[in-house]
Regions:
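Short, acidic Ser/Thr/Gly-rich low-complexity loop/linker segments typical of extracellular
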Residues: 47-62
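A short, solvent-exposed loop/turn motif at the edges and junctions
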Residues: 48-50, 76-87, 448-449
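N-terminal, polar/Ser/Thr-rich
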Residues: 113-374, 472-474, 806-811
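Hydrophobic helix-coil surface modules that form long, contiguous segments used
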Residues: 340-345, 349-389, 394-397, 402, ...
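Zinc-dependent metallopeptidase catalytic helix centered on the HExxH motif
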Residues: 460, 471, 475-476, 484, ...
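Acidic/His/Gly-enriched intrinsically disordered linker/tail segments
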Residues: 670, 674-749, 775-776
């Protein structure tokens, strides 16, 4: 499942010694008339290249390769509407070539955008913000400025305001001596800070602060300034360094903060300020970039309404980030609501953070024969607050916007800097819309890197949620009207229901509609064959799409090549049908009546969209086939294959039927889907299910508790509720192992303590149906799930005597304690042939307030059967007696690993 990122991958590049690669191939691409051709694809292969180099010609038809060794190279140049040109060159010195592409025979017409983009980055106010310089400077001495939980002490120095833009000052530069203090607003965030820096508050001396703010925040600085003085040279240099730093995008992130702040969805600060300049009532914000004595790039943000870190989907307004990708202290140090909200009792993770709400998208996409994408998206939206003119979209920076139009067909200004810059896409309305009224804009865009060829007929879909201008990510649901035009040998499988298919010359056209609003749109693409499977129990229409050829990186697996893809697909569809039936029984109906199971050319990655699932090739193999492939069974990989299909199918409920409110609550999606995979192993697998089921929970326990090379276990990295903030250089894979594995355990433990010998899972099933039904039209939060659980709790679960499950959620969601259990028992003959079971149970390695209900099992010769559960509090030992009808073969505590323990 996407995004937010689900797995964060850090790739480190080794620098190649420059004296080994000294030559380049450059040139221009033109048509027969001499007109230059932009966006032509140039693929270079040859001397010692382990993989092709792929370039695109710029708006002037120019291209230039990186440094190459001397030798023979083949250039393959392609562009939709032209014949492909293949040319071989001998590289001895630097080469500059002029290449001409012949116009191809008539085919489906694709409009190639013009070279000039007069409305791109051309809004006059935006241009002024982009080039803003220094204004007046004032001396500052022993001035203190407080912004929520943080205090800036400007002990000695100068404060230089930036020049006004449209009459508004949007920033300042402090040079001198100062001190920064941050005191967390809550105990939970103080604990998180202590885990990171071994201190419960932040203290940092600084010599430089760059401030960017809205007009309201600027007024606070006038209370502490002295007399006007000459601008210091250091201020101009500091501003230039700041511009260079925050405007640079890193395509391959080295750290979590680099991914957030300088990655694909990075902010364009000037465009954010443009929104505030155009709307005086824009939600106020302040960004402070602190050059400290110990930490050279601390960033303190206060952003009301939209959240301090929109890239993290954060409901909190206040953040402190240590941006230092090369340091072990890199990370999000602090993220919380404003202190005033806690004082008023108004702090909430469920506030609407959107500025605009989207009702529908109509997207027409053409994929050319060289995998280039051309699209037009009509986006229907309504303003949610007054006065806003600037809309920020999520869009892959390699997809270049060519034109933005309003509903009347008039061109609109838009912002999208270069691919390697702060190239996020913003549209600028010609005037502010009226709150609650419907509006529409049309966005035309094109580019590469949405698709990557994996083999003959197979592709990786890389830009999974950013292949179209997405206004609010997973934060809202909208209707989608999707039309795809692709080379006719290929097939698109999309979210929604297929409305029609046709062929236009060499292109296949398909039209899809979502019958109800969904959070995101996606598609799979390749040379697919189709197989269908009926589900008479749920009425679900299940379709499988499989590839007939292996991707290039799996060609060495000859055993896989010999397996029948259709029968392998039938295996995956059988698993899908079983999981659909199981989830429908336990959780209720999903919002969809069909599901498309599509093979993707990846061996170890799956993902779920609304009624569309990507499965890795490995999911199509059973244990016998995996033995044929590898000659042995790797327990970890075998576990992944067992879990991936039921996990991804379960996302039709967890993530799509029920969304999540913020990064704090993503465990309700990933953890619940992981739990559903375990439920599948227990309920839907014939034969000896106990072995696979117990091994599943053993694997999860190991993922939660096993320490990494820094001696830190995922569980010790922080509570589930911290979500993506668990990511740091020292904690490594903590986010995945806590959110997925411990999240699954939380739901399993609720199931365990709700279980009764008479009704078994009846109360749990009622709770899960209620949870799904009550959250079909709104995102779920940890607290809203807790409220549903409390409606269905039994008397034995009320360990605090107040009808609440605070004790459970404080321990397992907001806390990190995990108990250790030990049991000794005696079997004592009783009257009438019965046996008294005397148990001594010890709970340890927790505090005195920790309470839990632990299940007890006995085996009378037919396998372990549950006879009840024992409540125990703190580090203590308690005894209990139970009268049994006969002598058991064995007695065990927590026999099926229902409770997480050490």
């Amino acid at each position: 499942m996407p995004f937010v990122p689900k797995l964060v991958l850090f790739i480190f590049w080794l620098t190649v010694s420059s004296h080994l690669l000294a030559e380049t191939i450059s040139g221009t691409i033109s048509d027969p008339s001499g007109a230059l051709i932009p966006a032509a694809r140039i693929e270079i292969t040859g001397t010692d290249l382990s993989q092709p180099i792929v370039l695109s010609s710029d708006s002037e038809g120019r291209f230039s390769s990186p440094d190459l060794k001397p030798g023979s190279y083949t250039l393959r140049i392609s562009r939709d509407g032209f014949e492909t040109l293949v040319k071989t060159l001998e590289l001895k010195d630097k080469l500059n070539v002029r290449l001409s592409l012949a116009i191809s025979k008539p085919r489906v017409q694709v409009e190639v955008p013009g070279k000039k983009l007069p409305y791109a980055n051309s809004d006059p106010v935006y241009r002024s913000l982009r080039s803003v310089g220094l204004g007046t400077t004032y001396s500052v001495s022993n001035a203190t400025f407080s912004f929520d939980t943080a205090t800036f002490q400007f002990q000695k120095g100068t404060l230089t305001f930036l020049s006004p833009v449209n009459g508004v000052v949007t920033g300042a530069v402090f040079i001198g001596e100062g001190h920064f203090t941050l005191k967390p607003a809550t105990a939970l965030d103080a604990q998180e800070l202590k885990r990171r820096i071994s201190a419960s508050q932040v203290e940092e001396d600084f010599t430089e602060v760059i401030l960017r703010f809205t007009a309201e925040e600027r007024r606070k600085f006038f209370l502490g300034i002295g007399e006007q003085v000459q601008n210091p040279a250091e201020a101009a240099a500091a501003l230039d360094r700041w511009k260079d730093r925050v405007r640079k995008r890193h395509e391959v992130a080295q750290s979590f903060t680099e991914q957030l702040l300088q990655g694909e969805t990075m902010d364009n600060v000037d465009a954010d300020l443009l929104a505030a300049v155009y709307n005086p009532a824009h939600p106020p914000f302040i960004n402070a970039y602190i050059r400290g004595s110990k930490h050279k790039d601390l960033r303190y943000f206060i952003r009301t309404r939209v959240g301090a870190l929109p890239q993290l989907d954060s409901p909190e307004e206040v953040a402190l980030i240590n941006y230092d990708p090369d340091s072990m202290e890199d990370g999000v140090w602090y993220l919380d609501h404003m202190g005033a909200e806690y004082q008023k009792g108004t702090a909430s993770d469920e506030e609407d953070r959107r500025l605009f709400g989207t009702s529908s998208y109509k997207i027409e996409t053409v994929i050319s024969k060289n995998d280039h994408l051309f699209s037009q998206a009509v986006i229907n939206f309504r303003p949610l607050i007054d006065g806003e003119r600037v809309l920020k979209f999520g869009l892959l920076p390699n997809l270049r916007v060519m034109r933005v139009l309003d509903a009347q067909g008039q061109d609109l200004y838009f912002v999208q800097e270069g691919r390697k810059e702060d190239g996020s896409f913003y549209a600028v309305l010609s005037k502010a819309g009226e709150k609650g009224k419907d509006y529409a804009i049309t966005v035309q865009y094109e580019g590469d890197k949405v698709l990557e060829k994996a083999g003959d007929g197979s592709f990786y879909v890389r830009a999974r949620s950013s292949w179209y201008p997405n206004l609010n990510g997973f934060g809202e649901r909208a209707l989608y009207d999707l039309t795809y035009k692709v080379p006719k040998r290929y097939k698109v499988i999309s979210v929604g229901n297929l409305q029609s298919e046709s062929v236009e010359q060499d292109f296949a056209v398909s039209h899809w509609l979502t019958p109800a609003p969904v959070a995101v749109a996606g598609f799979n693409y390749g040379q697919y064959q189709k197989l269908e499977l009926a589900d008479e129990v749920t009425g679900y229409k299940i379709s499988g799409y499989y590839l007939t050829e292996l991707p290039d990186d799996l060609h060495n697996f000859q055993a896989l090549r010999s397996m029948a893809p259709q029968s392998m697909t039938k295996y995956a569809l059988d698993q899908t049908r079983a999981q659909v039936q199981l989830c429908t029984h336990y959780f209720g109906k999903s919002p969809f009546d069909r599901i498309y199971i599509t093979e993707q050319p990846n061996f170890a990655f799956g993902q779920s969209w609304p009624n569309l699932v990507y499965l890795p090739i490995s999911a199509y193999t059973d244990s016998t086939q995996r033995w044929m492939l590898f000659g042995n069974i790797n327990a970890s990989f075998n576990g992944f294959v067992q879990e991936v299909t039921p996990h991804e199918v379960a996302h039709q409920w967890w993530g799509h039927a029920v969304g999540w409110a913020s990064y704090h609550d993503q465990w309700l999606s990933e953890g619940f889907a992981e739990f559903s995979a375990g439920l599948f192993l227990q309920q839907a697998v014939a034969g000896n299910w106990r072995k696979d089921y117990i091994e599943f929970w053993d694997r999860l326990q190991k993922r939660i508790l096993e320490k990494n090379n820094f001696g830190i276990s995922p569980n010790d990295s922080g509570p589930i509720w911290m979500g993506l903030r668990l990511i740091s250089p020292r904690t490594e894979n903590a986010y995945q192992n806590v959110t997925y594995a411990k999240g699954a355990y939380v739901l399993q433990m609720l199931r365990s303590i709700m279980y009764s010998p008479d009704d078994q899972d009846k109360a749990f099933i009622a709770m899960m149906h209620d949870f799904v039904d009550s959250h079909r039209d709104k995102p779920a939060s940890t607290e809203s799930f807790k409220a549903v659980a409390e409606k269905h709790m039994s008397k034995i679960m009320d360990l605090s005597g107040n009808g609440k499950l605070d004790w459970f959620f404080n321990e397992w969601v907001y806390g990190t304690q995990i108990p250790r259990y030990h049991m000794e028992y005696q079997l004592i003959p009783a009257e009438a042939g019965k046996v008294k079971l005397h148990m001594t149970i010890t709970q340890s390695e927790v505090d005195d307030h920790f309470v839990m209900l632990v299940p007890v099992f006995v085996d009378f010769g037919k396998g372990m059967a549950r006879i009840g559960q024992v409540g125990i509090a703190g580090n203590t030992t308690r005894t209990a007696d139970v009268l049994l009808p006969e002598k058991p073969k064995k007695v065990a505590l927590n026999a099926y690993k229902d409770i997480l323990e050490r």
